[in-house]
Amino acid sequence: LTNSWKRINGSWYYFGADGAMTTGWKYVDGYKFYFGTDGKMVQDVDKLIGKQSSYRITVNRVKCQVTVYAANETGNYCIPVKTFTCSVGLPGTPTPTGTFTTPAKYRWHTLMGPSYGQYCTRIVGGVLFHSVAGSNMTSHNLSAGNYNMLGQPASHGCVRLCVRDAKWIYDNCALGTTVTISDTAAMLFDKPATIKIPAGQDWDPTDPNV
């Protein structure tokens, strides 16, 4: 194996020109990845690189996945930092494609219904990143059925996330962050497994306020 990726027991490894397993930071196809001492690609480098002054976000509508990028030393946003599972708009109310800059954030925001979402970051118009919406402005507001749709198209156009991931964007991505939404955006990390909650559970297990 040379200059190629290999998946072994659920983890990604990269073998360089000499056939040796890559460790540490490495550019592959223009992106900068980190491989542990065991050779496994690390699929969340947030703590490794620390909080950055700026990020860029891409959303892939087909995969229902979000990836956050940081810039390298030359200002190229080529370091995948984190990836999130999301829900985008249903076919009748699709999430718009294009490149946008975030104009506003809200700790809670009134959404369709009305319903209420946490850790909202506006993308464009009425389209926001937000937690799965519930019936009131408390952490105990969810419909399990709604929550369990995360990872597939389910919204009126917004990009739904679990509370942990919506909060990460809210806390870390400054206003003016560039967000690109398409059907073809590269998703360089594996799509995280969705969390399922039992009928009758009304809170998000990733919510730090529960």
Q: Each predicted region: which residue ranges?
A:
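Extracellular adhesion/carbohydrate-binding repeat motifs centered on closely spaced tryptophans
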Residues: L1-S53
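A structural detector for beta-sheet-dominated domains
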Residues: N9, D29, G36, N60, ...
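Short loop/turn microsegments at loop-to-beta-strand junctions
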Residues: G10, G30, S54, C64, ...
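Residue-level signal for short segments within beta-strands and strand-turn junctions
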Residues: G16, G36, V68-N72, D183
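Residues immediately flanking
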Residues: A17, T37, K63, A104-K105, ...
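Gly/Pro-biased beta-strand-loop elements
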Residues: L48-L142, D207
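Exported/periplasmic cell-wall-interacting domains
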Residues: P94, Y106-V210
